[in-house]
Each structure stands twice: as structure tokens, then as C-alpha cells.
Amino acid sequence: MQTLAQHLSSQGIQAPLAQLLTTLADTSKAISHAVRHGALAGVLGATEQENVQGETQKKLDVITNDMLKEALTADSTVRGLASEEEDHIVEVGQSGDFLVCFDPLDGSSNIDINSLVGTIFSVLPAPSGELSEQSFLQPGRQQVAAGYVLYGPSTMLALTTGQGVQLFTLNPETNEYLLTNEAMSISKDTSEFAINMSNQRFWEAPMQTYIADLLLGKIGPREKSFNMRWIAAMVGDVHRVLSRGGLFTYPTDNKNPEKPYKLRLMYEANPMSFLVEQAGGKASTGYETIMDILPSEIHQRVAVILGSANEVDACLEYHGQDYSEEPSL
């Protein structure tokens, strides 16, 4: 099996990007160690702080953010970074080639119940000139690399540099990432979907009708049965989609009219969309392709529908219909 370093070399990845990806991978090993120790290290539970999103920070949110921030600040290839846990961008150096956006610990509500969590990252080219928030506001198509690390029964790194999606598994004996799937591929069709059903009454009419038709199974217009899955961590649900197909969505809702979207574009939706598209899937808000969106600010939120191409298309057909009346559920 190839190590991560061997794979990056065989793919012809230039030295600066290889260095940055190695920094991210090495930091994820330390994060994996911290996550595994959990209560033994006193890192579970919440802090008294809130992040810029107004969300209460878990202790591990802060710890993992600091670990990534410290490692990336020391990496000469990094010009600046943006994190879910940082109010503003962080300028790192004057000459780095890359900007890094990341969610240090996705699914942190799962920490205290010992369920799946992960790290998501996106790498963008650093433009010339003075660094500002505007420097980061690039469409997802500009990403040069993206990936996530899943901290589960084993620690796995899914990575794309625009040459498909590769999956690496951390060998606990050698502490090396080894290539265990050289070409992750999403099936075009599926009978699985992932959505937070507790928000059903708050969804837009197209999504309500789409999900209602899935739940009707063989007696409904789709004429086949579907199973629902929900891990409550985007990183876990998207990993399942990449592993065996499916559709994952966190759609628009009016639960809080001031926050109609849940997921962040720059460090959740964009990197996951890059991975999904590279594996043969599709990613949309319901009305536009996610990676074509020009961001308006670093913590911008969007609706997300991604996964098996034909099922995403089926969902989008509902969004193109006329809903002058609310569907009956």
C-alpha cells in the first residue's frame, strides 16, 4: 500500500501543495489522538464560549481549532486561513501560495456520545496583493484540493486534488496514512437518503413533496422503497455517500427566518461538493450548483443537496415545479 507521501509524489503534486497536505494530515493524526482519549484527557463537554455562528463551542472545537491554526501558521506555504471557530480570517505569512478554510471538528454535538466526528478542509490559491477577506471569496471551482478526516472506528482521510478521490486509512501501529481506495466512486442511482426529518414542517414545498414521495416507497410515484440514514455529522453522512452512494441534504428551512441555511459554504459545502463531483456525483443548493457560487462572506451558509447524480437530478426536478399550494403530508 502506498503512503500518503508516496501517493502525492506519484500523482505529480507540486512540492508546496504536497507540503500543505502533509501538514493537514499530520495535524489530523494529533486530533485523532485527542478525540480517542476523550474523557480520559478531560476534553469532553462544552465551554462557556460561542463562535461567530452563535453556537456554543465544545472543548474539542477549541482544542482542534488551535491545533490546526498552530500547524498551518508554521507552514510556509500558507498565506492565510479561515475557520468555523474564528470570527475573522487569520493572516499567516506574506509569501504563501495557499489559503486554507476548515471546520476543525464537524459534528461536535456527537462528541459527548462517542459518535462520528471529523475535520473538513478546503485549499484555495492565494491571490497576489494585500490579504483580506475578499481574497478568500472564490468560487468552489477554484479549489486546488479538498478533503476530510473521519474519526471513527478507524481514522480515514478522503482527499482530492482534482484527480478523483482517494481514501487513506491511518495505520495505528506506524501512524502512517495508507492508500486503501484509489478511486472512490458514487453510484448514479441509490435507494438511501439522509436528512434531518425533525425539520420537515419548516422545509420549502419542493423538498417536502420530494421527501414525501420517497417515503411512499413502491406505492408512490418513485415506485421503489428508500431507506433513511442520519448520522448528524455532515462528514459521516458524506462519507457514506462516497462509500456506497446515496443522497445527503440539509435544505432551506424557515425554522429561523434569519438563518434559512445550516451548512457553511467555504469550509463545508464547497470541499464536500468538490469531493462528490470528483467521485461522479452532483452537488446543488436546489437552484444552483454549489461550486459555482461566488461567496459573499467567509461564514456564508447555503442549502446543500449532494450525492448520487440521478437522485440529485430527481430532487432538482421538484425544485423546478410550480408550488402554488402547499403539499399535504
Swiss-Prot record:
Substrate binds at residues 106-109, 196, 262. GO terms for cellular component: cytosol. Mg(2+) 2 binds at residues 103, 106, 268. Keywords: Carbohydrate metabolism, Cytoplasm, Hydrolase, Magnesium, Metal-binding. It catalyses: beta-D-fructose 1,6-bisphosphate + H2O = beta-D-fructose 6-phosphate + phosphate. InterPro entries: FBPase_C_dom, FBPase_class-1, FBPase_N, FBPtase. Mg(2+) 1 binds at residues 84, 103, 105. It holds the Pfam family FBPase. Its cofactor is Mg(2+). This is Fructose-1,6-bisphosphatase class 1. It comes from Shewanella loihica (strain ATCC BAA-1088 / PV-4).
